[in-house]
Amino acid sequence: MIITTTPTVENRQIIEYKGLVFGEVVAGANIIRDFFASITDMIGGRSGVYEDKLNVARQEALVELQKQARNIGANAVIGVSIQYQSMGKKDMFIIVATGTAVVIG
């Protein structure tokens, strides 16, 4: 399945628009545990533990987006956008991937 942030797929014609699809993932972060686990990463100015959590959650959101698109008969998702938002007491976050499911030829 083609997943793209662009509104079209180069050299491919959109045959049918199937509708808006979403992939949503809520993840948690234990700040105290993660802080001690990543103290070395933070000395370098980056937190590898949090980056890894974001990467995994983003991939899960994209997998969910693809599942929704397949379930409605699409073979591509165009105009994909990914949003990040903290929730609650900042120890939870949500990643939402959205796009338009289409059939391309």
UniProtKB/Swiss-Prot annotation:
Domain of life: Bacteria
Coiled coil location: none
Gene3D superfamilies: Hypothetical protein apc22750. Chain B (3.30.110.70)
A Pfam family that the UniProt record links to this protein: YbjQ_1
Family under the similarity heading: Belongs to the UPF0145 family.
PANTHER family: UPF0145 PROTEIN YBJQ (PTHR34068:SF1)
Protein name: UPF0145 protein HD_1349
Taxonomic lineage from the root: Bacteria, Pseudomonadati, Pseudomonadota, Gammaproteobacteria, Pasteurellales
